[in-house]
Amino acid sequence: MRPSFLLLSVATGIRIMYCKDDCLRDYQQEMKTRLFEEWELHRSVMVQMPTGTGKTHLLAAIVREFLCGSDTRVWIVAHRRELVEQIEETVARYGMRKEDGSVKVMSIQWLSRNRKAMDGQPDLIVIDEAHHALAETYRELWKKYPEARKLGMTATPCRLNRKGFTDLFDTLITSWSIVEFIGRGWLSSFDYVSIRANSKEQRLIDSLKKRGADGDYQVKEMNAVLNRETGIRRLYESVRRHAAGKKGIVYAVSIAHARQIAAYYSLHGVKSVAIDSKTPASERGKLVEAFRQGEISVLVNVGIFSEGFDCPDVEFVQLARPTLSLAKYLQQVGRGLRKSDDKESCMLIDNVGLHRIFGLPVCDRDWEAMFEGRMAGNAQLRTRMENNGLSVSCSLSEDSKRNEGLEIVMTHNCLLDAIRKGDLICLGGGGPVGGEQRTALKACHDRQSGLWGLRCGNKITVIPQYREVFDICANRAAVRFEDGRTGVVDDSGTPLMVTDRCRRLRFLKGELLSVT
């Protein structure tokens, strides 16, 4: 018998039965518990979990509990047909079938065309890959069904244009960092190789000037610059040198680019196929299954496998498409971080130098700031990322150092060693895994009261009670108290010093600098 308790939402009066779910991993159970607690106060919640950590399984478990003991309807909305099919399969494994009528899984395109034909009102609307939810088709759901509870699931709550999600979602729940998931064995470690900063390839990418409607690089210009035989030959040489005999995914800039890559790889003995939006759904499914069975070594795609592709035995990911979008970068590399029994680590081959503008996948991200629209999910200045110490000192062979095209940025052994030692500053992380200070101390904002608190990872260490958090250094924060005075507190909120009113406090090389 699973222990259960009843939540009564103060805000809505809706009764929700919550049960401990034994089939979930510990972090999924933690996220589920936190979600139901947030639903006591808020109607609309966004949940962030890294790619490969089981968002769809968590989604299914949440929906099953939401339906427990009550006559309720749940709509699950995705932005692509493939995601709909994947979610339907997972939901069915949790004992909920579409024939029952209580759960409907659909694409946003289908729902927009057929909303008038839908029976009844949904009690819960779940948005998969919720970073797309700012589109008007999704906003219509909020307007049409204001009383329905909302849940958004995403690995990347950020937008290239810096638009926040607070118009739709009341609060954000963040999971562990990628560093902690790797340290605890839930995500795969990785090796990371990249083109060199002064390479011809990097100079070509730096020459891209045109932008598309979404603010990212223009596809037409990327194709003209990068879809050349010399460039495709370099892509192949990178795979031959660093991922020979492995199964992998390649991200291309265009349909023509993908087909040229697949043809060149196949011609040179690496069985590859190109998949894009023009590939019929039935054929696409067969090709993916052939890849799972090992009959195809490489899938070259254009925007198809950035989200929702679930194949844990992907052994390498090749980035052949430049992007200014943090979400695209993390979604793509995340395809290789899923764990499988036979995979020691994943090889990430960065042929477009993305780590220089986004950092490594293990870098700490301020999801709260991006969720609120205070920070864009875009590329940072290259000089800032290069000087941020995003690699560690590894003992490399002379052959590696002489590598003509690529340099080794990180090895999986160096990464695991850094995580074990808690030496995460060099990785852009926040602190030792598994300890009290495993992630950086950060400010957290309560939009209802307007006050600020402190959190370490997922744990709120100081409830919102400050008018401002000026600066943070290690386990100390410079704050403005509710009475207007300023001071320094530790990570538990204990005042270390209090000063008279001033305009700003900040830390400078460990010392406090007061600006009046």
Regions found by a protein language model. Name each.
Residues L416-T516:
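Residue-level detector of conserved, function-critical positions
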Residues G336-V362:
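Conserved segment of the helicase C-terminal RecA-like domain
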Residues I14-V45:
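Conserved pre-motif I regulatory segment
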Residues S325-D341:
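Conserved SF2 helicase motif VI
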Residues W176-I249:
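Conserved interdomain linker/interface between the two RecA-like ATPase lobes of SF2 helicase motors
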Residues K271-A274, T279-N301:
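Conserved helicase ATPase core of P-loop NTP-dependent helicases/translocases
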Residues A135-F190:
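Post-DEXD/H (motif II) to motif III coupling segment of the RecA-like Helicase ATP-binding lobe
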Residues E307-P322, C346-I349:
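A short beta-strand element within the Helicase C-terminal
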